[in-house]
């Protein structure tokens, strides 16, 4: 297989990771792939000896397979094509990728460029044509420019429609304002660039985008350093950008830094322009000392920077904007316009998220809580190496634990081997990433998803302080509890005079959790909120079981009752059961869990016939009894003296007993 194919697969994965798109998200999607390339050296090398002709040469080295291999490997269903227009190939691909999004042919577009050199014969033919530099330097705009230096590179970019990228919370680095492609047509020679055709293309691209060329402050030129190419391109740039501008236009070419990547050179220029927009710095050119005499830099208002320059906008209120130009030796020209993303009022972070205004209490909660940071890799050793790189990055760069946890949890593909770190403090996070505790050692994930069962309790298991830490540290849990309060306050009758949130936060002296009309809806609300939080984390039950009023939360988890219906049923159940205990003249009741068999319980209750009865069989050796409070207290003391498990439930009445006949109101 051509190394280009293997490297392209790797670079595409890195581009998706940078964009915050997981493999699960993109697999099977309507994603287009366009690959720009020029030469096919590996094929030329492997087919020199026809007696040794690999069986899979066609699929392993064919240029068309470069794009198709990516679509095949990642299971992408949009358009897939390899483009060869020589040096403008990848910028033409960029145009096609943007076009596929505009025409709704794709929801995502992956644009790649590739240039790997193995065959020395190509160097010879290019030297014969006078394309290559005689001194091994690419000198854009310089009098000593004699051609370009061939560079190697594999590059990838991911495109999305802006509204979709913002809605998905993707990492947006720049905005594409316009793209265009044309051809020189007939001219003096097929390899001779045309200033007129390039100027026409730039003009039409800006007109379609509804932009004014004079507002652009940087142009990334094709800039090969050839005697024929540079003067014509810079003349075209002057014609379009500088005739009506008051200031100087900065121009440059990444080829002076990394050489000419030929089929991948357009993407290299796009990447340079994107980073310049992000950093707000215009990068310098190398190997520029004496201006080319055929270029009137002063009167054309052009400047090639030789030192980094802060990208000042002066009094301009428009965003920073850059143009990227590229042309092939066969006459195909391409142009793209990029704009900084910050101009749209959104902050660019490690993982771009839609702007959300949180109440101060929720914002503080997000900052101070501990976070789970999942770590993942293809092997234990690879995971250890990656973890060290991550720890080094976090040491050298400022980042919040919340941001890092978000990126690792939702914007990274989960591979077979896993580890994790949990903390609210970045120093401890770094320490645990480098030296994970035994429970967080790198391990292979299970081949099958474990079956999880949820057990839901009824009243009596509540305790002072329950759910308080979740209310204080988990915004989703707090919001769900407040949703419960809104539902209860919207009831047409018998709406509560209290709130679930307030009751959970009361002091131990003031809490009313022991009263049935409070405990049943509150226990249900807490369990409903837990179901939603766990589901948000991706934890869903394979089976559920509910005990007593816990059946209501269980039916919600099973999808049999809606959230609102489960809560309202629990509330009215508690209201009517609690009203029995509060009725004038009603006898105080109690409930108790005992660790005995049915026969043993029956024998123990014989002296209390009519006063205590079995309320529930929890297991063959665990029963709940219910009855008059004084009788339950007496039985508890007797069992405790004999060291038999007996624990009072936190209820104020004897449910499932004669005391609860008031339920007939239903």
Swiss-Prot record:
Domain of life: Eukaryota
MF-aspect GO terms: 3-oxoacyl-[acyl-carrier-protein] synthase activity; fatty acid synthase activity; ligase activity
Gene3D superfamilies, A to Z: 3.40.47.10, Malonyl-Coenzyme A Acyl Carrier Protein, domain 2
Cited InterPro entries: Ac_transferase_dom_sf, Acyl_transferase_dom, Acyl_Trfase/lysoPLipase, Ketoacyl_synth_AS, Ketoacyl_synth_C, Ketoacyl_synth_N, Malonyl_transacylase_ACP-bd, PKS_assoc
Protein name according to UniProt: Hybrid PKS-NRPS synthetase pytA
Pathway: Secondary metabolite biosynthesis
Knockout mutant characteristics: Impairs the production of pyranterreones.
Entry remark concerning the domains of this protein: The N-terminal part acts as a polyketide synthase and includes a ketosynthase (KS) domain that catalyzes repeated decarboxylative condensation to elongate the polyketide backbone; a malonyl-CoA:ACP transacylase (MAT) domain that selects and transfers the extender unit malonyl-CoA; a dehydratase (DH) domain that reduces hydroxyl groups to enoyl groups; an enoylreductase (ER) domain that reduces enoyl groups to alkyl group; a ketoreductase (KR) domain that catalyzes beta-ketoreduction steps; and an acyl-carrier protein (ACP) that serves as the tether of the growing and completed polyketide via its phosphopantetheinyl arm.
Example of a GO biological process term: fatty acid biosynthetic process
UniProt entry tagged with the keyword Ion transport: no
Ranges where the Ketosynthase family 3 (KS3) domain occurs: 1-340
Positions of the catalytic residues: 87 (for beta-ketoacyl synthase activity), 222 (for beta-ketoacyl synthase activity), 260 (for beta-ketoacyl synthase activity), 548 (for malonyltransferase activity)
Family statement: In the C-terminal section; belongs to the NRP synthetase family.
Alphabetized UniProt keyword annotations: Ligase, Multifunctional enzyme, Phosphopantetheine, Phosphoprotein, Transferase
Organism: Aspergillus terreus (strain NIH 2624 / FGSC A1156)
CDD domains cross-referenced by the UniProt entry: PKS
């Amino acid at each position: 297989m051509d190394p280009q194919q293997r490297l392209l697969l790797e670079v595409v994965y890195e581009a998706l990771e940078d964009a915050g798109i997981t493999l699960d998200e993109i697999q099977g999607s309507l994603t287009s792939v366009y690959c720009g390339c020029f030469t096919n050296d590996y094929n030329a090398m492997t087919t020199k000896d026809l007696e040794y002709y690999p069986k899979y040469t066609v699929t392993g080295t064919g240029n068309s397979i470069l794009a198709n291999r990516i679509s095949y490997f990642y299971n992408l269903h949009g358009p897939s094509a390899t483009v060869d227009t020589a040096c403008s190939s990848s910028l033409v691909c960029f145009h096609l990728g943007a076009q596929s999004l505009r025409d709704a042919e794709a929801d995502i577009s992956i644009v790649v460029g590739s240039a790997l050199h193995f065959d020395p014969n190509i160097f010879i033919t290019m030297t014969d044509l006078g394309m290559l530099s005689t001194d091994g330097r690419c000198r854009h705009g310089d009098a000593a420019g004699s051609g370009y230096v061939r560079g190697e590179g594999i590059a990838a970019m991911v495109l999305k429609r802006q509204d979709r990228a913002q809605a998905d919370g993707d990492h947006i680095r720049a905005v594409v304002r316009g793209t265009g492609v044309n051809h020189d047509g007939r001219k003096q020679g097929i390899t001779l660039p045309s200033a007129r055709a390039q100027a026409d293309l730039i003009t039409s691209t800006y007109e379609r985008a509804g932009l004014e060329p004079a507002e652009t402050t940087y142009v990334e030129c094709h800039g090969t350093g050839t005697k024929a190419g540079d003067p014509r391109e810079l003349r075209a740039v002057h014609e379009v950008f500088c005739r009506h501008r008051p200031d100087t236009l900065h121009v440059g070419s990444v080829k002076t830094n990394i050489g000419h990547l030929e089929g991948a050179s357009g993407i290299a220029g796009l990447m340079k322009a994107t980073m310049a927009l992000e950093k707000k710095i215009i990068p310098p050119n190398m190997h520029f000392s004496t201006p080319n005499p055929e270029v009137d830099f002063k009167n054309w208002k052009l400047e090639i920077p030789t030192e980094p320059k802060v990208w000042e906008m002066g009094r301009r209120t428009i965003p920073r904007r850059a143009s990227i130009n590229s042309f092939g030796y066969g006459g195909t020209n391409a142009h793209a316009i990029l704009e900084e993303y910050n101009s749209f009022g959104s902050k660019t972070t490690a993982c771009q998220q839609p702007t959300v205004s949180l109440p101060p209490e929720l914002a503080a909660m997000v900052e101070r809580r501990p976070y789970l940071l999942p770590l993942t890799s293809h092997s234990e050793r690879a995971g250890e190496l990656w973890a060290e790189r991550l720890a080094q990055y976090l040491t050298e760069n400022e980042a919040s634990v919340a941001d890092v946890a978000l990126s690792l949890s939702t914007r990274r593909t989960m591979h077979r081997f896993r580890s994790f770190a949990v903390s609210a403090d970045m120093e401890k996070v770094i320490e645990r990433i480098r030296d994970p505790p035994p429970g967080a050692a790198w391990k292979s994930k299970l081949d099958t998803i474990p079956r999880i069962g949820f057990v839901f309790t009824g009243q009596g298991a509540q305790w002072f302080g329950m759910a308080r830490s979740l209310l204080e540290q988990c915004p989703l849990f707090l919001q769900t509890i407040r949703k419960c309060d809104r539902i209860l306050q919207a009831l047409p009758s018998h709406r509560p005079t209290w709130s679930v949130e307030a009751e959970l936060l009361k002091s131990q002296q003031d809490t009313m959790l022991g009263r049935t009309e409070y405990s049943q809806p509150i226990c249900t609300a807490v369990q409903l909120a837990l179901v939603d939080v766990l589901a948000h984390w991706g934890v869903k039950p394979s089976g559920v079981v509910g005990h007593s009023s816990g059946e209501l939360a269980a039916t919600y988890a099973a999808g049999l009752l809606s959230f609102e219906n489960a809560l309202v049923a629990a509330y009215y159940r508690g209201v009517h059961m609690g009203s029995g205990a509060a009725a004038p003249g009603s006898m105080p009741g109690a409930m108790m869990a005992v660790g005995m068999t049915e026969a043993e319980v029956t024998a123990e209750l014989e002296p209390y016939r009519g006063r205590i009865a079995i309320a529930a069989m929890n297991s063959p050796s665990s029963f709940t009894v219910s009855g008059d409070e004084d009788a339950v207290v007496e039985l508890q003391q007797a069992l405790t003296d004999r060291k038999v498990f007996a624990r009072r439930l936190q209820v104020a009445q004897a449910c499932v007993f004669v005391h609860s006949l008031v339920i007939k109101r239903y």
